[in-house]
Swiss-Prot record:
Protein's name according to its UniProt entry: 6,7-dimethyl-8-ribityllumazine synthase
Sequence positions that bind 5-amino-6-(D-ribitylamino)uracil: F22, A57, V58, E59, C81, V82, I83, F114
Sequence positions that bind (2S)-2-hydroxy-3-oxobutyl phosphate: G86, T87, R128
Subunit structure: Forms an icosahedral capsid composed of 60 subunits, arranged as a dodecamer of pentamers.
Keyword tags: Riboflavin biosynthesis, Transferase
InterPro entries named in the record: LS, LS/RS, LS/RS_sf
Any single Gene Ontology cellular-component annotation: cytoplasm
Main function: Catalyzes the formation of 6,7-dimethyl-8-ribityllumazine by condensation of 5-amino-6-(D-ribitylamino)uracil with 3,4-dihydroxy-2-butanone 4-phosphate. This is the penultimate step in the biosynthesis of riboflavin.
Cited CDD domains: Lumazine_synthase-I
Length: 156
């Protein structure tokens, strides 16, 4: 039986991180976690990491699509934070963003790791940005690294 698994080191990989500015006090912690993980676990140098900022979570799929279209990157890590408010806006933003990022991944055959917090409260966001519940930016970076290696193994 053949089992294909990917590790984390990918020293020659080029990674784009697309990150929304809205809720930046949370997003910057996610970004720090992602970059640290790419460097430590992926052994990726600063020269192979590009950070692209956009206004909000709804814009992430378009930015990810443009990045993927260049063909310059091996994976994209999407980061952001959407906090539920008192209107249905949260549901629309989260749904469309998630669908859009998945579509980019399939359309361009590139890993698009999901590191966007979709939470009910600011406390939940803080917990997931590097305190009690780990750092979801770091977890998304690990997912991107593993997917680069899994796809490489499948293609070889």
């Amino acid at each position: 039986m053949k089992v294909i698994e990917g590790g984390f080191p990918a020293p020659n990989a080029k990674i784009a991180i697309v990150i929304s500015r809205f809720n930046s006090f949370i997003n910057e912690s996610l970004l720090s976690g992602a970059i640290d993980t790419l460097k430590r676990h992926g052994q990726i140098s600063d020269d192979n990491i590009t950070v692209v900022r956009c206004p909000g979570a709804v814009e992430l799929p378009l930015v990810a699509q443009r990045v993927a279209k260049t063909g310059d990157y091996d994976a994209i890590v999407s980061l952001g934070c959407v906090i539920r408010g008192g209107t249905p806006h949260f549901d629309y933003v989260c749904s469309e963003m998630n669908k859009g990022l998945a579509q980019v991944s399939l359309e361009f055959s590139i890993p698009v790791a999901f590191g966007v917090l979709t939470v009910d409260t600011i406390d939940q966001a803080i917990e997931r940005a590097g305190t009690k519940a780990g750092n979801k930016g770091a977890e998304a970076a690990l997912s991107a690294l593993e997917m680069i290696n899994v796809l490489s193994e499948i293609d070889s």
